[in-house]
Amino acid sequence: MLSTPVTSQLRLKEFQDVYEPAEDTFALLDALEKDAKKLRQMAEMKNLLTAEIGCGSGCASSFLKSGILKNKPIVHFMSDISNSACRASKITALNNRELYKDDNGLFITVQTSFLDGIRLGNGVDILIFNPPYVPTEFEEIPSEAATIASAWAGGTDGMDVTSTLLNQLKDILSQDGVFYMVAVARNKLHSICEILQKDGFIVNETLKRKAGRETLSILRIYRIGNTIWDE
């Protein structure tokens, strides 16, 4: 079992608006570790381009890049609308490269919405996303990037932010790529499946876990015909 990345810098006041690793984060880490063998198999086949959207603390990014895919020649992008989150993620990446003894590959942090402005085309091989999934009134979705609410307020059915990415996924993920996303039961998982199936994707619920009043699901999503992930 891999160690959880260290994110001790989040105790500093300058990072008070950065979402700290919580049950949803740990569920995502467990899902990634569950698939570690296949993820490493992907890295043996080619130099991967990987990314996390809404990187927050950078915990999941460091776990994937420096933990599971340690010493692989990977370029990993971390994006967030929050400047504080981008800075926190960069520190997490640097600190945990030493922890995991990861001496290869590259972390790139970009302050942006989704992957806007980063010309990756259909080039992302592994994509991870722990979206703001809590159902809220639309007015509760913050317009300011530096608010902690931007990490959890998901609007109607908790799907406002997620739906935007799902509609872009076919233009982001590589042919043999895989996408891991956190969701909760209130997000209407059947609707997520319907949206993605129309675009030629297969959706697997790879992990399910209770967290307080929520039921967390980690979805593994890939294109039809992806021979690595077809089960």
UniProtKB/Swiss-Prot annotation:
Binding site for substrate: 130-133
Keywords: Cytoplasm, Methyltransferase, Nucleus, S-adenosyl-L-methionine, Transferase
Subcellular location per the Swiss-Prot or TrEMBL entry: Cytoplasm; Nucleus
Catalytic reactions of this protein: L-glutaminyl-[peptide chain release factor] + S-adenosyl-L-methionine = N(5)-methyl-L-glutaminyl-[peptide chain release factor] + S-adenosyl-L-homocysteine + H(+)
InterPro entries: DNA_methylase_N6_adenine_CS, Euk-Arch_PrmC-MTase, SAM-dependent_MTases_sf
Gene Ontology BP annotations: cellular response to heat; cytoplasmic translational termination; methylation
Predominant location: cytoplasm
Coiled-coil ranges per UniProt: none
Keyword match Transferase: yes
Example of a GO MF term: protein-(glutamine-N5) methyltransferase activity
GO CC annotation, single: nucleus
Keyword Protein transport: no
Binding site for S-adenosyl-L-methionine: 54-58, 80, 130
EC number: 2.1.1.297
Described purpose of this protein according to its UniProt entry: Methylates eRF1 on 'Gln-182' using S-adenosyl L-methionine as methyl donor. eRF1 needs to be complexed to eRF3 in its GTP-bound form to be efficiently methylated.
Subunit composition and interactions: Heterodimer of mtq2-trm112. mtq2 is the catalytic subunit carrying the catalytic and the S-adenosyl L-methionine binding sites.
Stated family: Belongs to the eukaryotic/archaeal PrmC-related family.
PANTHER family: METHYLTRANSFERASE N6AMT1
UniProt name for this protein: eRF1 methyltransferase catalytic subunit mtq2
Organism: Schizosaccharomyces pombe (strain 972 / ATCC 24843) (Fission yeast)
